[in-house]
């Protein structure tokens, strides 16, 4: 959840692999 909103968190290691960050 937190990884996708806001998308800025996609820079995080654990968030990067998520589809919402691709």
From Swiss-Prot:
It is found in: Secreted. Disulfide bonds join 3-15, 4-20, 10-21. Transmembrane segments: none annotated. The modification 4-hydroxyproline is found at residues 6-7, 17. It comes from the Eukaryota. The modification Alanine amide is found at residue 22. Its main location: secreted. Coiled coil: none annotated. GO terms for molecular function: sodium channel inhibitor activity; toxin activity. InterPro entries: Conotoxin_mu-typ. Pfam families: Mu-conotoxin. One of its GO terms (cellular component) is extracellular region. Expressed by the venom duct. The record marks 18 as: Increases tethering of the N-terminus (compared to GIIIA), forming a more compact structure. PROSITE patterns: MU_CONOTOXIN (PS60013). Keywords: Amidation, Disulfide bond, Hydroxylation, Ion channel impairing toxin, Neurotoxin, Secreted, Toxin, Voltage-gated sodium channel impairing toxin. Belongs to the conotoxin M superfamily. Mu-conotoxins block voltage-gated sodium channels (Nav). This toxin shows potent activity on Nav1.4/SCN4A (IC(50)=286 nM), and weak activity on mNav1.6/SCN8A. Negative results: does not show activity when tested (1 uM) on rNav1.2/SCN2A, hNav1.5/SCN7A, hNav1.7/SCN9A and hNav1.8/ SCN10A. The cysteine framework is III (CC-C-C-CC). This is Mu-conotoxin GIIIC. It comes from Conus geographus (Geography cone). The lineage of its organism: Eukaryota, Metazoa, Spiralia, Lophotrochozoa, Mollusca.
């Amino acid at each position: 959840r937190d990884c996708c909103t806001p998308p800025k968190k996609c820079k995080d290691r654990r968030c990067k692999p998520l589809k919402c960050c691709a």
